[in-house]
Regions:
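Boundary-proximal intrinsically disordered activation/regulatory segments immediately upstream
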Residues: 1-67, 155-157
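Short acidic-hydrophobic, aromatic-tinged amphipathic segments that line or gate anion-handling sites
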Residues: 7-11, 80-85, 174-182
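Amphipathic alpha-helical repeat scaffolds
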Residues: 40, 129-137, 250-255
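Short, aromatic/basic amphipathic alpha-helical patches
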Residues: 66-78, 231-232
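Short beta->alpha connector loops at strand-helix junctions that form conserved
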Residues: 84-85, 126, 152-153, 175, ...
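Structured adenosyl-cofactor binding patch, chiefly the S-adenosyl-L-methionine
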Residues: 100-103, 140-144, 158-171, 230-268
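RNA substrate-binding interface of SAM-dependent RNA methyltransferases
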Residues: 108-204
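Active-site/ligand-binding-proximal alpha/beta "capping" segment
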Residues: 197-247
């Protein structure tokens, strides 16, 4: 720990910890300054060891320094580690940071869509505005071997603090492209030879378990409630998950997990 830059914070107005002031308000800005916040031990570990993102600084409750000593060895040289008592940290952040662990990182350049299209298994998120659902979708994608994720411009940022936490840090290392329209994504995927499954509860859609798994496959998930736009479904291959009579849908992240598990089990 002696080789690391440990800085004790005693004043909530200290400009050095500006990125951590009012974390929830920062969430609302969507990281307009090109930085984002990571919360918790597991996401921090991934940020330091597996992520493609550059770490700016850490802000830890002083009681967390010793328990995190082995992990903090992975903090890049020159990255400051700010520390404060729990009460001051909570005051600075604007709410109780029960885990006592925050980090600030830089988004860097957007990953190009062509990099995602080089994979074989792609997940596409269309108009998912719920951070929990986006985070869970990333976690499921990581669990079932997805190569990359395409997130349309109307979906929430996968680097939103809560989305990162719910993803168990998967959004920090799993390749993704954020932007554009779902219909355009489907066209780009088909042009690259992908079969595109549009997950929908429509009764005229093909049953998931009857589908052979193609070599190149993209699975598209839409928002709960409205689902996928009709035009997007028409441009893809509509697929439904068979369910008990009288029930036609599950949570979007659950639907994604079921579809991805079907594909994964067919290959393993």
């Amino acid at each position: 720990m002696s080789a690391k830059t440990i800085i004790q914070i005693t004043d909530r107005g200290d400009p050095r910890i500006a990125p951590f002031i009012g974390v929830r308000e920062r969430d609302l800005t969507g990281g307009a300054d090109g930085r984002f916040i990571v919360e918790g031990k597991v996401p921090l570990s991934i940020l330091l060891t597996q992520s493609r993102f550059e770490v700016d600084s850490l802000f830890l409750c002083e009681t967390r320094l010793a328990p995190l000593a082995s992990l903090l060895k992975d903090v890049p040289k020159g990255v400051p580690i700010y520390t404060a008592p729990q009460s001051l940290m909570d005051e600075i952040a604007g709410f109780p940071i029960h885990r006592g662990i925050l980090a600030c990182a830089r988004k860097g350049s957007q990953m190009d869509l062509s990099a995602i299209l080089s994979g074989q298994r792609i997940l596409v998120l269309n108009q998912l505005s719920n951070h929990d659902n986006v985070g869970a979708a990333f976690r499921n994608a990581a669990a079932f071997g997805v190569d990359g994720i395409i997130v349309d411009s109307q979906s929430c940022d996968p680097l939103y603090r809560k989305a990162i936490r719910v993803s168990s840090g998967a959004s920090l290392w799993l390749p993704f492209h954020h932007g554009g329209r779902g219909e355009d994504h489907v066209s780009a995927l088909k042009a690259e030879g992908f079969a595109v499954w549009a997950m929908t509860p429509r009764t005229d859609a093909a049953a998931l378990y009857a589908q052979p798994v193609p070599d190149k496959l993209a699975i598209v998930l839409g928002a709960e409630g409205p689902g996928l736009p009709d035009g997007l479904i028409a441009a893809a291959h509509p697929v439904r998950i068979p369910m008990s009579p009288g029930f036609d849908s599950v949570n979007v992240a659950t639907a994604g997990a079921i579809a991805l598990a079907h594909v994964f089990s067919a290959e393993h």
